[in-house]
Regions:
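Active-site-proximal helices and loops of the catalytic beta/alpha 8
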Residues: 1-108, 139-143, 154-233, 242-256, ...
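Aromatic-anchored helix/helix-loop segment that forms the rim or "lid"
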Residues: 113, 118-138
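Short edge beta-strand/loop segments characteristic of extracellular beta-sandwich folds
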Residues: 237-239
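Solvent-exposed beta-strand/loop surfaces of large extracellular or lumenal domains
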Residues: 259-273
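C-terminal beta-strand-rich structural cap/linker in extracellular carbohydrate-active enzymes
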Residues: 270-289
Length: 289
């Protein structure tokens, strides 16, 4: 809660305003930590003015980036307020890697719980559909460049409310989730996407070209993400968050053979753009390597 590292008084409404003295204090803390351990990772729960967060990031600190509401909305099947674009630093004053994005945290409600409580159609009642939608969420989370945080058991579709036993109450462990095929499938999707980031990190560095169409207006026709590394590696994500199959008009960067990284199936792209039939609540992660 580094927003409180200041001697200036404020209200709830003004606490996040730019504060040069707070920046100076946190820079001093950061420098002291790095004198002891130059490799230390300093992450702040700050949630302040972007100019202030940018200056802190320029000093090598990282700051939480809360996208819980957007990913909860998409998880429940609602296009309103489901814009993912604030997850990334592109088009902002933040240096690359300054934000650590998250879909869930200790302070926010579980996406899977909100599916059960408020989801649209089968997202409320069918665990197989819920896990597919959460896999689509993950595919548009981990393939976006920049650091990410995963809150515990989110990879299994943990659906116990944050209010269970009180907000800070002990929450039940559910390792048996992995005995459920749908939940295990979601966990495998997380693992594969993290492996992709680790083994092909050049796709996710500042030198790569990144674009995505993930705003509210990009709901009914499909959502898209494209990454192009300088070594020729390409990645294209196509997702359908709706309750019906769609014909997603997809602009692959090049023709040729593409592989769905999540299941290994091949796609021969002979023309650009290409129409792809994407079933309801599903996602494809295509690579050309």
């Amino acid at each position: 809660m580094t927003k409180g590292f200041t001697q200036n008084s404020s209200t709830e409404a003004t606490a996040g305003n730019y504060d040069a003295s707070r920046i100076a204090i946190l820079k001093d803390y950061n420098e002291t930590v790095r004198e002891v351990n130059p490799e230390a990772v300093v992450i702040l729960e700050h949630f302040c003015d972007e100019k202030e967060e940018s200056e802190l990031a320029e000093e090598g600190m990282q700051l939480w980036r809360n996208l819980n509401n957007a990913y909860c909305q998409s998880a429940m099947g609602y296009p309103s307020n489901s814009d993912f674009t604030p997850l990334v630093t592109f088009g902002t004053t933040m240096p690359y890697g300054g934000w650590v994005g998250f879909m869930e945290s200790h302070d926010e409600e579980r996406t899977a719980f909100k599916q059960i409580a408020y989801g649209e159609g089968p997202l409320k009642s069918d665990i197989n559909v819920r896990m597919k939608q959460l896999a689509a969420n993950a595919s548009f989370f981990f393939t976006a460049p920049g650091p990410k945080m995963v809150w515990q058991f989110g990879e299994m579709g943990y659906d116990v409310s944050i209010e269970e036993g009180g907000r800070t109450g002990r929450k039940p462990l559910h390792w048996e989730y992995l005995d459920n095929e749908a939940r295990k499938g979601l966990c495998n999707t997380y693992a594969k996407l993290l492996k992709l980031r680790r083994e092909h990190s050049e796709l996710f560095n500042p030198g790569s070209t990144f674009s995505w169409l993930v705003k509210t207006a990009n709901w009914t026709g499909g959502r898209f993400l494209t990454l192009a590394a300088t070594n020729g590696k390409r990645l294209v994500v196509v997702g359908n968050f709706t309750a019906k199959p769609i014909e997603a008009i997809t602009s692959f960067p090049v023709t040729g053979v593409w592989t769905n990284y999540l299941d290994g199936t091949k796609l021969h792209v002979t023309s650009i753009p290409t129409g792809l039939t994407i079933p309801a609540h599903e996602c494809r992660v295509y690579i050309n390597f």
